[in-house]
């Protein structure tokens, strides 16, 4: 019903609806929840958003987002600087960090190549990656890109550009997840798992 909420509340709902995973109904529910919890949730959220606006920046080395530049990953002396893990997005970097999957450093491309979406090499930070790969201390580039058509296209493109760098280029293995049942896996995953089988 139009006019049920004032313009300020409607603006809040419209902005919340822009967030991934929130449609108009979910945004309306979220707005109502925030308003009901004004002191306990809305005020701290507004404060945290303002701090993020003021303090968060993109790392000029790897593309991570942090409150310092270079980021805490790039400046951590315990990290193995001979390894660069290439990811499409900061969310992928965070997922690898949560899993403690690597002790290397990162490079965030910003996306994957996607001609259908109009994303070309010039839209990614591939040139910066190639430059980093030529640093004398770098020994391995790990392509931690999604096993999608766009991810694989990006991996092949990057690999071709790194041919003259004196680095080993590897990619994540693909296949059966831990706890996965064969009957529930798609054909592409099963085929990749069979091709990349290892000694037991």
UniProtKB/Swiss-Prot annotation:
Transmembrane segments: none annotated. One of its GO terms (biological process) is DNA repair. GO terms for molecular function: DNA binding; zinc ion binding. Residues 82-177 form the Toprim domain. A zinc finger (C4-type) spans 59-74. Pfam families: RecR_C, RecR_HhH, Toprim_4. Keywords: DNA damage, DNA recombination, DNA repair, Metal-binding, Zinc, Zinc-finger. Belongs to the RecR family. May play a role in DNA repair. It seems to be involved in an RecBC-independent recombinational process of DNA repair. It may act with RecF and RecO. This is Recombination protein RecR.
